[in-house]
Amino acid sequence: MPEYRSKTSTHGRNMAGARALWRATGVMETDFGKPIIAVANSFTQFVPGHVHLHNMGQLVAREIEKAGAIAKEFNTIAIDDGIAMGHSGMLYSLPSRDLIADSIEYMVNAHCADALVCISNCDKITPGMLIAAMRLNIPTIFVSGGPMEAGKVIGVANIQPERRLDLIDAMIESADDNISNRQVEEVEQNACPTCGSCSGMFTANSMNCLTEALGLSLPGNGSYLATHVGRKELFLEAGRMIVEITKRYYEQNDETVLPRSIATKKAFENAMTMDIAMGGSTNTILHLLAVANEAGVDFKMADIDRLSRVVPCICKTAPNNHDYYMEDVHRAGGIFAILKELDKAGKLHTDVHTIHAPTLKDAIEKWDVTNPENTHAIERFKAAPGGVRTTQAFSQNRMWKTLDLDREKGCIRDVAHAYSQDGGLAVLFGNIAERGCVVKTAGVDESILKFTGRARVFESQEDAVEGILGNQIVAGDIVIIRYEGPKGGPGMQEMLYPTSYLKSKGLGKACALLTDGRFSGGTSGLSIGHASPEAAEGGAIGLVHEGDTVEIDIPNRSIRLVISDEELAARRAEMEARGSKAWKPENRDRYVSAALRAYGAMATSADKGAVRDVAQIER
């Protein structure tokens, strides 16, 4: 029987000093002996996805205390990728994932907490907390802040009278010379109307949905709007449930509630299957690989490639399809509706267990909104957007009169009526990316699934943006942005501005982009990232010359620099001959702080999840 970790600091004569300090935090005499549950919040006023979380930690804490445990809240950092986008701030985004994981490990282990509630929401916070959960392997539950409502705008030129939109529209239209300043301002003012993670299937929402598929959060976690009063119940339920599973582990020796027991290889395959089916962000591949690595699960790019070939795309939302947003996914039954359709097609391992059900099969049946007997599920997924600008959680209670149960033409479809039989994400291999690169196929127009073009080589995102806005890129070009990987950046910047600007120039279906960096969850188009090995690690993307021909073949999962093996070997030898200047950008002036240099010294390429490899500095 495992012993409560907290006894280390709450029991024994020698811990009198520690108990004195616990008392100073509000712990009463009768509390000693109760489990201590850490509540890791990520509230910040910098991020709309986190601005409403200031009271959420205490909401969970009070419920934990009612259930018979001690709750202690602390905070971790949260970076807004959208605000950090397009300048040097983006260098810090991915490294913050590891900093978040470390900070949670430090707090939980330093204070001997018995269990953990993770209150996350945006891009790197959920992955960072997942890494921490796997590392600590104590009872853990995730509850996120929820998605933002989609924006609405009326009267923008050359479109229907009213449309829904998101921050990506603001980025694209700001660079379109055909749209006036007034029209851009109107989009800007309406794109992000409420608190919450951005309204499409971008990275934040993709990751929060994946916590459901992994079995570490409650149904609705990924889709229940931040503004809806009903979401409050998820926080209260998380508070009650963490006490229950904590006692099951420490008092009944039930190891099935531990993160590593839940997030098995089967669970990772389920999560990736669901991700492919909903056309999630390519960042999810990076993060799932990192989380699996921390969990000690043998889940690799080859597994993702295998799944991507057999899983159809059955849910297609913004940025891949502007007919649907997260609020529509919720109305259609949320993540468990997607899981149900995948299960019907035999695409899931439903014998895995979750924190809230003995098996995934049980959970799918319980939360099936097509079953009229599941009134609790039907009521939860009728939650609708309020349509009022706000930064307040639980501020509206609007409900849909009906759910979207149309599995032929609705938001979520059955496999027979899939948006495409090819999944929403794919892994490509070839001489330019021997260990793979990734593309969100759900966002690629069918006309360019096969594409051959001329390489236009840039050694920084900034230079690429300057080239695109300076009209140096024409139809048929393939923009190569290298030395932007985890080590080469360092920090693996997102390339949302280059892809957005290609669209604003009318080149969204006429050009491709390949990088060893990564993309925002808001990216669509023929945007291929995570080229591994990265240029700074000796990857062949560093050997591409201006004007080379590159062939992309998504149906056959290949990408190729059209030169002979002998020529490629000669270029590699020439590069190696540069000595200390080899595998470094030739003409880039970029300040890199000590913190970023430390990350870059340990960073691995994207095919390994861009995790830190301490051995690289120990050698």
Curated annotation (Swiss-Prot):
Disulfide-bonded cysteines: none
GO BP terms in the entry: isoleucine biosynthetic process; L-valine biosynthetic process
PROSITE patterns (alphabetical): ILVD_EDD_1, ILVD_EDD_2
GO MF term set: 2 iron, 2 sulfur cluster binding; dihydroxy-acid dehydratase activity; magnesium ion binding
Enzyme Commission number(s) of this protein: 4.2.1.9
Catalytic activity annotation: (2R)-2,3-dihydroxy-3-methylbutanoate = 3-methyl-2-oxobutanoate + H2O; (2R,3R)-2,3-dihydroxy-3-methylpentanoate = (S)-3-methyl-2-oxopentanoate + H2O
Keywords noted in UniProt: 2Fe-2S, Amino-acid biosynthesis, Branched-chain amino acid biosynthesis, Iron, Iron-sulfur, Lyase, Magnesium, Metal-binding
Cross-referenced Gene3D superfamilies: IlvD/EDD C-terminal domain-like (3.50.30.80)
Cofactor: [2Fe-2S] cluster; Mg(2+)
Binding site for [2Fe-2S] cluster: C122, C198
Modified residues (N6-carboxylysine): K124
Superkingdom, natural source: Bacteria
Active site location: S520
Family the UniProt entry places it in: Belongs to the IlvD/Edd family.
Subunit structure: Homodimer.
Protein name: Dihydroxy-acid dehydratase
Gene name tied to this protein: ilvD
